[in-house]
Amino acid sequence: MDEERALYIVRAGEAGAIERVLRDYSDKHRATFKFESADEDKRKKLCEGIFKVLVKGVPTTCQVPCLEVLRILSRDKKILAPVTTEENMQILLRLAKLHESDDSLEKVSEFPVIVESLKCLCNIVFNSQVAQQLSLELNLAAKLCNLLRKCKDRKFINDIKCFDLRLLFVLSLLHTDIRSQLRYELQGLPLLTQILESAFSIKWTDEYESAIDHSGPPLSPQETDCAIEALKALFNVTVDSWKVHKESDSHQFRVMAAVLRHCLLIVGPTEDKTEELHSNAVNLLSNVPVSCLDVLICPLTHEETAQEAATLDELPGDKTAEKDTALKSSAMVYNGMNMEAIHVLLSFMEKRIDKGSSYREGLTPVLSLLTECSRAHRNIRKFLKDQVLPPLRDVTNRPEVGSTVRNKLVRLMTHVDLGVKQIAAEFLFVLCKERVDSLLKYTGYGNAAGLLAARGLLAGGRGDNWYSEDEDTDTEEYKNAKPKEELLKPMGLKPDGTITPLEEALSQYSVIEETSSDTD
């Protein structure tokens, strides 16, 4: 009945009446996502009628409800045949200011029309393979990049940027050819990185360092949404970027990683939005070549170093809250390097563990990122080892019992999801510099057996990667408990597969123990 009435008024052709009836339809069906199949033909005819109205050049006040209704109807894949013609797609491109490269964005009154047109295109392209093919033929990705360049520094048109970026994300998600076009032909990597810089209002203090105002206001909802869409589009553009072949590529990835470091250190308007923002930043960091992730940490300036040394001494004894803040800040500094971003990643990982669900989608990206960072960058590994595997003092409880980050990760080593338990074990193994004896010390033999069996290390030894050597960090508690722990060591094996006699196994272990040290 709603479609019949709307179609009758739309065909009558009076702009004021069309505006009223379509606004009523839009208000009533704003949250409708499932449609009656009996009215399918009426909805198709209503779409055709709306395009005829849009061609006439009706006022903006009438164009907006027309596009709102078209957006609602385009949620139904079955009625998109009359919508996905080249003529109708061109109408939407014109209304979205995508039809001309030199068209300006000066008329504020047109902004709602541009936004609604982009929303329609998002739905239509996502739901129709015909529209996807037309998007390639009409070079829609290039037109979207041109629109972004017009508005990348204009904060008052965040909605336009947001839906432009969303449409870019949809296109690059559905077509690998568009990913390649965005990356190389359209210079999508620097363009989208600049969009992020604008959303975060970044002020650079060095080539790869930005000023962080911890006391500043959170991002606005519009800035946060815009940043999230840019992060998602960048993920698609860089999804195959495992190796850097040119110096210019390396520089651009480092700039992007520095922007993502800034992203991790700011907050959105709500806790949920902050988590969504950081989650997309983590996903994108996973695409950055690991050699470029060194910019996640940066040296303290002379002023910061002096302030770090003086803060605790200057605070009087009764200033407990201030001292707690200073201690927290000090915990994010390691070996003269600012580790705030790594600390945020570690906290993010722990929150995802505490959720207790969707580990594969929510936890494995950040665990993989921290593992690769630790393997490639010594300072990051040493900082994470200090946070996750501090000197072992609790030798009375099993490694998986407790509420520390170590306990939580050890519990994951026996998780039912193979991918989750593998990456949790790999992370701890890398923090132990791939030394079997060190891993057993922190996790226990039973928890580590799966990883060691997969790597052929059940008899001991270490992994293939090289790590620097440092001093022994065994605590007195661990040294006292060690004789008991040695009783649980597995027996040795002879080349023919028979068990080594106990005396020979113990003497071999003593030699190994004398020539090795448990390090950082």
Curated annotation (Swiss-Prot):
The lineage of its organism: Eukaryota, Metazoa, Chordata, Craniata, Vertebrata. Keywords: Chaperone, Cytoplasm, Guanine-nucleotide releasing factor, Phosphoprotein. The modification Phosphoserine is found at S468. One of its GO terms (cellular component) is cell cortex. GO terms for biological process: G protein-coupled receptor signaling pathway; regulation of G protein-coupled receptor signaling pathway; sensory perception of smell. It comes from the Eukaryota. Its main location: cytoplasm. Belongs to the synembryn family. The modification Phosphothreonine is found at T473. Chaperone that specifically binds and folds nascent G(s) G-alpha proteins (GNAS and GNAL) prior to G protein heterotrimer formation, promoting their association with the plasma membrane. Also acts as a guanine nucleotide exchange factor (GEF) for G(s) proteins by stimulating exchange of bound GDP for free GTP. Acts as an important component for odorant signal transduction by mediating GNAL (G(olf)-alpha) folding, thereby promoting-dependent cAMP accumulation in olfactory sensory neurons. Interacts with GDP-bound G(s) G-alpha proteins GNAL and GNAS. Does not interact with G-alpha proteins when they are in complex with subunits beta and gamma. This is Chaperone Ric-8B. It is found in: Cytoplasm, Cell cortex. One of its GO terms (molecular function) is G-protein alpha-subunit binding.
